[in-house]
Regions:
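A glycine/proline-hinged amphipathic helix-loop "lid/cap" segment
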Residues: 1-78, 248-249, 350-379, 385
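Short, well-ordered amphipathic alpha-helices
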Residues: 62-68, 104-114, 144-151, 173-191, ...
Length: 429
């Protein structure tokens, strides 16, 4: 069955895929979800990367090599020890989609990060509540809670986190950042950043992000009949997710998102990568946001635009065969972007920690000119002195019970599973 699905995914004309998605997204919720789920269900070999979670902290999936062999405790340990953590929020018009719908992209990123940089990455992909059962701001609260659990609950430093969101997921990523760092912005556009207890994340990836609730731009007029996103879907989002007209527009902070046009560093990471299609309805709104960010000059912005429809970077089937090389090209570009951003963020964190230690020393310590000064090394300092390219012991010493039927790993050539006959256990390296 997987082979059949692979053939369909690889050989379906982009125009057919686009029309199928466009139609499915406007169907009643149950039918729409079933179609999208079937089109995006992980293939057999991709399932080895998946570990599902559903607890009081968050719901979603941890995606990393051989997660299928991990229990919850080990999976969380691997997340915490990873060099890069990608906090992923899927799209789907707030009414369809799931945390493993882009496994082709996810596996590509993980493999590239390991093969090119010898670094380990883990993707924390969120399953938020879907409309119409879960209306705004419920799904946003799910994302904010999950991000808080990642950073404060698990203690993962934002300096090694890259947020990623496409379409509706892009809106949720932006709102999650605002709610976490500057929650008053959507009520008062001049409101300052409030949360300085933790640094901003290292980077953000936004693929065809929804950045405006208004459908009056020129690109909306030009492409609403041919894009994946239609006026019909927009009306469903208004009704099912935003609960219009029962809810007043002034009571919906998300409807003011497009008014944020300056001081983006109150909530945006230093490094931002944006993809957009030249044939999509959201194009003009995204371009306006990108131009505003560029004008300020405080953000390292990488902006990619290709002559395709909505969310082409994540939905590979929308790209013509002759242009498939673009996916590989931009996957590698995204990986390079992630690694550079993580290195920059970690370097800044090291500097901040050092300056803080010196400041505290100057306030509380008497220094004699001939005295050698030795500062206590905190746990954070220990972690920060670790090379980005070092192997973590955790990845080399994880013990797993031997499965009933032992199979060699064929998913990633850079990982191997060896059986330790003396201890009767398997070791993942």
């Amino acid at each position: 069955m997987d082979d059949i699905r692979k053939v369909i995914k690889r050989n379906s004309p982009p125009a057919v895929v686009l029309q199928t998605l466009r139609t499915a997204l406007q169907m009643p919720p149950a039918a729409a979800r079933n179609i999208v789920k079937d089109l995006t269900r992980p293939l057999g070999d991709q399932k080895r990367f998946i570990r599902k979670f559903d607890n009081e902290h968050w719901k979603g999936t941890l995606i990393m090599s051989e997660m299928i062999r991990c229990d919850d405790t080990i999976a969380i340990q691997r997340l915490k020890k990873a060099d890069i953590v990608i906090f992923e929020v899927h799209g789907g018009g707030f009414r369809v989609g799931h945390s493993t719908m882009y496994m082709e992209s996810f596996v590509s990123w993980l493999r590239l990060i390991k093969s090119k940089y010898n670094m380990y990455a883990c993707i924390m992909s969120i399953d938020y509540g879907l409309a119409p059962k879960h209306k705004y701001p419920g799904p946003l609260n799910d994302c904010v809670k999950a991000f808080d659990y990642l950073t404060n609950g698990l203690g993962v430093s934002p300096s090694k986190i890259v947020l990623s969101g496409d379409s509706a997921g892009g809106a949720l990523v932006l709102e999650t950042l605002i709610e976490t760092y500057a929650p008053s912005i959507l009520y008062d556009l001049s409101a300052p950043r409030e949360n300085f207890d933790q640094p901003l994340p290292a980077a953000a990836l936004l693929s065809s992000p929804l950045v405006s609730g208004v459908i009056e731009s020129e690109s909306w007029k030009q492409f609403h009949k041919t894009d994946v996103v239609s006026l019909g879907l927009a009306k469903l989002i208004y009704k099912e997710y935003l609960n219009l007209p029962e809810t007043k527009v002034e009571n919906l902070p998300i409807m003011r998102l497009h008014h944020v046009n300056n001081n983006f560093d109150r909530f945006l990471p230093k490094n931002v990568m944006v993809f957009i299609g030249d044939k999509e309805v959201l194009r003009d709104d995204v371009v306006n946001m990108v131009n505003a960010i560029k004008k300020e000059g405080r953000t390292n912005l990488l902006f990619i635009k290709e002559n395709y429809a909505h969310d082409w970077f994540m939905i590979h089937e929308l790209v013509k065969k002759k242009d498939k090389h673009l996916i590989a090209k931009y996957d590698e570009m995204f990986v390079d972007f992630c690694v550079d951003a993580i290195k920059e963020a970690r370097s800044q964190t090291d500097t901040t920690t050092t300056l803080k230690s010196i400041h505290e020393l100057s306030e509380y310590t008497t220094i004699h000119i001939n005295q050698s000064i030795k500062l206590p090394v905190t746990e954070i300092d220990k972690n920060s002195t670790q090379s980005l390219d070092e192997h973590f012991d955790l990845f080399e010493k994880i013990d797993f019970p031997i499965p009933a039927k032992h199979k060699s790993n064929t998913i990633l050539s850079e990982y191997a599973i060896f059986t330790d006959n003396s201890s009767k256990k398997s070791v993942l390296i």
